[in-house]
């Protein structure tokens, strides 16, 4: 019996429904009219008409189904409900494809304990569900999306989904048709797919082998229009395997939607309900609206996956301070995740004491020397530099920077010495990233350090009493997985301690703008009002306008009586500076006298009389330092220019434990991209593998040498590098967004700061610029005028940790002289700070030094292979090779554009050829030259970008052509930067070596 319908309202007749089917849909929060428009109950032979219609189905000569298929589908005769929608690919007519939920489901042949809940048309490709909706739902979606319904759309027989497609209405993709119906009911244009992998297809041959790239199913492709917001909202599952399966599906489908230029976001259901329909019914529409408003971009969501700790906690806490936590003696790997300022270091101090009571030595591994010294001071253990002159030596263990985990270091490190002992890796996430990517001392012996770390982990975990502690506010699966992968076949279950306590750090005022002038203006006003302030900076060099040194100079000029302490890597290692060695004793350094007061976080705190009005700190103060003094600082200020990770910014702001206002300026986009800059782990790894193979092949071909290397050295380390690189690259693209979101998660209330008047902020810019320039000019002159030292003196200075400013200048001068081979002038110092050396080096080997290039690359390659005992760390190896970059520039005929006197314009044939070639090979150019090319760039923009890698450019000389067709003209003008002198020095150096 047909349904009697009334437009705008439906007279519901239950003839087409069995009661349990009706109730099932109602219990999912679905509007009755939507149910009636799309769902019906079927029984007997009728379900066959809906499911068994494909011409691909094999039948007997009389047209009857084969016995096997009859047996397979016999269960559908017991009845069930059927649902289908409309077909956007067939003029929005009703879709033949749909789904049937049998009352008596059949067993899954592959999973005998599981039943197949839903049946879809046999031998037909899966489709998506576009449910019919009543007018009231259409209007509700219109109101929520803010997109009107023109009369022409309302009167169009193609209806609601044509309007959604035509007007770029945001859509939500869910798994399961009832979930889509539920979201439509509350005003969201929801599309359902039958499974998490049903939004895309991967071409395969008859044997199941993949023969092409994944692509969106046509239904979704139709709606994947540019700038449309598409949210993906799949079920929340508890099974680890299922969770991973769902996440992979979201990544793949999300990437394909992003390729179509959709704005892809992901809604993560918080639980406990599994599906979005259950969530809406249990928590209400307002709760889902909030989830929708807070949904994350695909990039943000992917990054978050690498930052989560999903290991089941053995101990869950929710307390301000960790206090005493008893760890069973049988536990080998202890993972501690607790917010900043909750007493992690204090708790670890107790664990160190316990190890000593049990006659176990303790190895403390950090990524910063100052942090290691501070921790050792707290733990009562010598830092490695103190071992020699200490009465206890290394009897209790020692602290060491991870850079020194090799035999040639001061530690003379041997992983076999730590059997049955304890290892503590504090701020483990930063330690591992420093190990895998830092360009500091560790890069020289990274392979050796990686080998020793792996042996250390295996020795400790395989010993009866050995223990490893991983501790950080940001420890994640990535860190735990990495350590477990290094353990190899040694199976250990992590003993995870999770403290869910979230401090209430107070207000954080965020300053907009392209530079932090408004923040400095606000700090000026705060200083005039009195109090004491902590200013955190991401830079420290004299050249940086917003770094520690320039700002110190600027504040001293503006406030001559202000007592300022600068804390950065130079000041803390300068014996003549007040900040020398201050990291381990910061609370005392900041103050004069005092008396003990109440306990904070399980340790005696001391309240002191003020000594400094302004403390300016670099990332030397990033981790492992706890400023516990109360009532001292009025506010914390931060200038973050995109060179630290987002987590490091949050760490730095949390060094002061007291709840005072934070004021920050964060650059919109960062600058520290890793690898090829991708946020895809697969892309990063594929790029490194391909570049390594190319480098080896080119060298072998060029010098006929056999480069036998272990290309598969520690794949677990390289995979962890790629995971972390994805996080860093995504953060750098949306740097400010990531930092602010992280601060919100830390409990801050982020508030937009008031704008500062143009005159006041411009005055700040002028004063900072003047201070920076004066300081930097003085430094360049001081370096150039410093005493020239011998090679042996230079080596001693390089190995020396504590250096005066004079010694740093001498070391810098010797380094520049060694690098360029010419007299060191203030101008040379300036240019070197401006990244001149890599530009000159590439230009030299493209031209005068081309004959020495293979020898140069081969020498570097053989050195790395020898140091690593046939193993290489691919990112380091690839950075050291120049031959592929030079070959690419030669292929692009770049030398043609360096011919003086030739005039160039964008329409020139040679420039258009260059553009076509660079666009065609843009990914190769990105991987080897680090230059990003897009189709939208002009030919002139492309050549200028390529020439900038050589420190060169085409100069604008004017416009030519008729008034209607005037074009900008350019020509190459040889630079007057004295690079010829450097090239000559390099040539003479090569000749001298060959003569010897």
For every predicted segment, state its role.
Residues 59-228:
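Phosphate-handling DNA/RNA-contact segment within nucleic-acid enzymes
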Residues 477-526:
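Interdomain hinge/linker at the junction between the two RecA-like core domains of SF2 helicases
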Residues 1-29, 33-35, 71, 163-169, ...:
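TOPRIM fold recognition
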Residues 627, 633-661:
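Conserved SF2 helicase motif VI
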Residues 379-417, 579-604:
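Inter-Walker segment of RecA-like/P-loop motor cores
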């Amino acid at each position: 019996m047909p349904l009697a319908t009334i437009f705008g309202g439906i007279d519901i007749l239950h003839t087409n429904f069995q009661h349990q089917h009706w109730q099932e849909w109602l219990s999912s929060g679905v509007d009755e009219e939507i149910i009636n428009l799309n769902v019906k109950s079927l029984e007997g032979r009728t379900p066959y008409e809906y499911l068994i219609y494909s011409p691909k189905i094999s039948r007997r000569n009389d047209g009857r189904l084969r016995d096997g298929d009859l047996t397979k589908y016999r269960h559908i005769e017991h009845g069930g409900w059927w649902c289908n929608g409309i077909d956007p690919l067939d003029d929005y007519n009703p879709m033949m494809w749909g789904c049937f939920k049998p009352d008596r489901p059949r067993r899954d042949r592959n999973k005998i304990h599981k039943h197949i809940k839903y049946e879809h048309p046999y031998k037909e490709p899966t489709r998506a569900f576009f449910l019919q909706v009543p007018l009231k739902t259409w209007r509700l979606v219109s109101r929520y999306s803010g997109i009107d319904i023109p009369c022409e759309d309302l009167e169009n027989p193609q209806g609601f989904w044509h309007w959604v497609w035509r007007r770029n209405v945001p859509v939500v993709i869910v798994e399961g048709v009832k979930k889509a119906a539920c979201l439509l009911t509350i005003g969201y244009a929801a599309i359902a797919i039958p499974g998490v992998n049903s939004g895309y297809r991967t071409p395969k041959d008859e044997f199941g082998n993949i023969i092409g790239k994944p692509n969106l199913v046509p239904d979704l492709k139709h709606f994947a229009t540019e700038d449309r917001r598409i949210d993906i909202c799949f079920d929340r599952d508890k099974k680890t395997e299922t969770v991973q399966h769902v996440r992979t599906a979201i990544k793949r489908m999300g990437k394909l939607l992003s390729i179509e230029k959709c704005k892809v976001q992901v809604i993560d259901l918080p639980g406990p309900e599994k599906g979005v329909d259950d969530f809406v019914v249990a928590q209400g529409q307002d709760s889902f609206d909030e989830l929708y408003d807070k949904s994350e971009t695909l990039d943000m969501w992917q990054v978050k996956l690498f930052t989560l700790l999903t290991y089941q906690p053995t101990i869950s806490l929710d307390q301000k301070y960790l206090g005493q936590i008893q760890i069973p003696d049988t536990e080998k790997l202890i993972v501690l995740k607790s917010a900043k300022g909750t007493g992690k270091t204090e708790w670890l101090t107790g664990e160190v004491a316990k190890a000593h009571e049990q006659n176990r030595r303790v190895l403390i591994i950090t990524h910063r020397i100052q942090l290691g010294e501070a921790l050792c001071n707290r733990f009562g253990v010598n830092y490695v530099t103190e071992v020699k002159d200490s009465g206890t030596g290394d009897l209790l263990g020692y602290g060491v920077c991870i850079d020194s985990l090799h035999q040639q270091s001061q530690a003379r490190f041997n992983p076999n010495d730590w059997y049955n002992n304890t290892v503590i890796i504090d701020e483990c996430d930063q330690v591992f990233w420093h190990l895998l990517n830092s360009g500091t001392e560790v890069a020289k012996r990274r392979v050796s350090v990686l080998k020793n770390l792996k042996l250390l982990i295996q020795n400790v975990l395989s010993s009866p009493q050995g223990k490893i502690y991983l501790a950080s506010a940001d420890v994640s699966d990535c860190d735990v997985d990495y350590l477990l992968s290094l353990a190899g076949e040694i199976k250990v279950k992590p003993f995870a301690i999770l403290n869910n306590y979230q401090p209430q750090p107070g207000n954080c005022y965020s300053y907009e703008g392209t530079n932090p002038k408004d923040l400095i203006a606000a700090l000026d006003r705060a200083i005039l009002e009195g109090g004491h302030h902590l200013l955190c900076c991401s830079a420290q060099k004299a050249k940086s306008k917003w770094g520690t040194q320039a700002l110190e100079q600027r504040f001293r000029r503006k406030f001559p009586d202000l007592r300022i302490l600068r804390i950065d890597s130079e000041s803390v290692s300068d014996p003549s500076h007040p900040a020398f060695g201050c990291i381990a004793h910061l609370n005392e350094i900041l103050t004069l006298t005092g008396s003990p007061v109440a306990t904070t976080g399980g340790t005696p705190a001391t309240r002191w009389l003020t000594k400094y009005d302004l403390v300016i700190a670099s990332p030397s103060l990033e981790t492992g330092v706890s400023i516990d003094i109360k009532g001292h600082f009025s506010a914390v200020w931060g200038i973050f220019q995109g060179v630290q990770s987002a987590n490091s910014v949050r760490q730095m702001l949390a060094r002061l434990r007291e709840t005072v206002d934070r004021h920050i300026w964060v650059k919109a986009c960062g600058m520290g991209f890793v690898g090829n800059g991708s946020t895809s782990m697969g892309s990063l790894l594929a790029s490194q593998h391909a570049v390594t193979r190319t480098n080896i092949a080119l060298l072998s071909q060029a010098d006929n040498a056999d480069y036998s290397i272990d290309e598969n050295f520690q794949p677990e380390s390289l995979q962890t590098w790629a995971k972390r690189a994805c996080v860093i690259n995504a953060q750098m693209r949306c740097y400010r967004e990531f930092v602010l979101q992280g601060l919100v998660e830390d409990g801050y209330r982020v508030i937009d700061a008031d704008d500062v008047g143009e005159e006041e902020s411009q005055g700040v810019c002028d004063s900072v610029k003047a201070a920076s320039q004066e300081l930097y000019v003085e430094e360049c002159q001081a370096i150039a005028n410093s005493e020239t030292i011998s090679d042996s003196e230079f080596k001693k200075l390089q190995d020396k940790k504590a250096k005066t400013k004079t010694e740093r200048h001498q070391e810098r001068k010797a380094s520049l002289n060694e690098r360029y081979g010419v007299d060191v002038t203030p101008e040379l110092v300036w240019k070197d700070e401006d990244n001149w050396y890599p530009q000159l080096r590439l230009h030299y080997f493209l031209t005068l030094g081309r004959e020495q290039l293979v020898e140069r690359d081969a020498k570097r390659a053989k050195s790395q292979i020898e140091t690593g005992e046939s193993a290489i760390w691919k990112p380091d190896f690839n950075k050291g090779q120049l031959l592929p970059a030079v070959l690419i520039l030669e292929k692009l005929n770049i030398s043609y554009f360096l011919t003086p006197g030739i005039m160039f314009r964008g329409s020139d044939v040679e420039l258009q050829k260059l553009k076509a070639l660079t666009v065609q090979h843009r990914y190769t150019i990105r991987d080897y030259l680090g230059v990003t090319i897009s189709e939208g760039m002009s030919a002139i923009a492309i050549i200028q970008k390529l020439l900038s890698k050589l420190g060169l450019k085409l100069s604008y000389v004017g416009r030519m052509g008729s008034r209607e067709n005037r074009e900008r003209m350019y020509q190459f003008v040889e630079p007057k930067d004295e690079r010829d002198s450097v090239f000559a020095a390099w040539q003479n150096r090569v000749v001298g070596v060959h003569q010897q």
